[in-house]
């Protein structure tokens, strides 16, 4: 099976390194085989190394090097933010950020909830084993 995510104009990518880490950007122009011009509604248009980008499955329909206003409209029309949040990759990153923001007491409460859940599962499993044996 071949590649499905190509470096192309309109491809949405996740920045995986540097000061813009974790931001969704759109490739607006390909500079050469190693660099692309990327833009997002909340940042300046910059040249970025492709090694810093993780390409997503989301592609929006834009022309080469669009104005900021056109880019924002295209992103809203394509519903990029919701598509990202509904994707499994986006959900995993949201969960990671939420877990990283937990304090010690929150982690303690989660530990107690896991212990309680494991006890309930163990009781139900024992009940089913008794029914099968009888």
Curated annotation (Swiss-Prot):
InterPro entries, per the entry: Rib_uL2_dom2, Ribosomal_eL14, Ribosomal_eL14_dom, Translation_prot_SH3-like_sf
A Pfam family: Ribosomal_L14e
Superkingdom of the organism of origin: Eukaryota
The keyword Chaperone is assigned to this record: no
GO molecular function, one term: structural constituent of ribosome
Cellular-component GO terms for this entry: cytosolic large ribosomal subunit; endoplasmic reticulum; mitochondrion; plasmodesma; vacuole
Keywords tagged on the record: Ribonucleoprotein, Ribosomal protein
The keyword Ribosomal protein belongs to this UniProt entry's keyword annotation: yes
Family as reported in the entry's similarity comment: Belongs to the eukaryotic ribosomal protein eL14 family.
Descriptive protein name: Large ribosomal subunit protein eL14z
Organism of derivation: Arabidopsis thaliana (Mouse-ear cress)
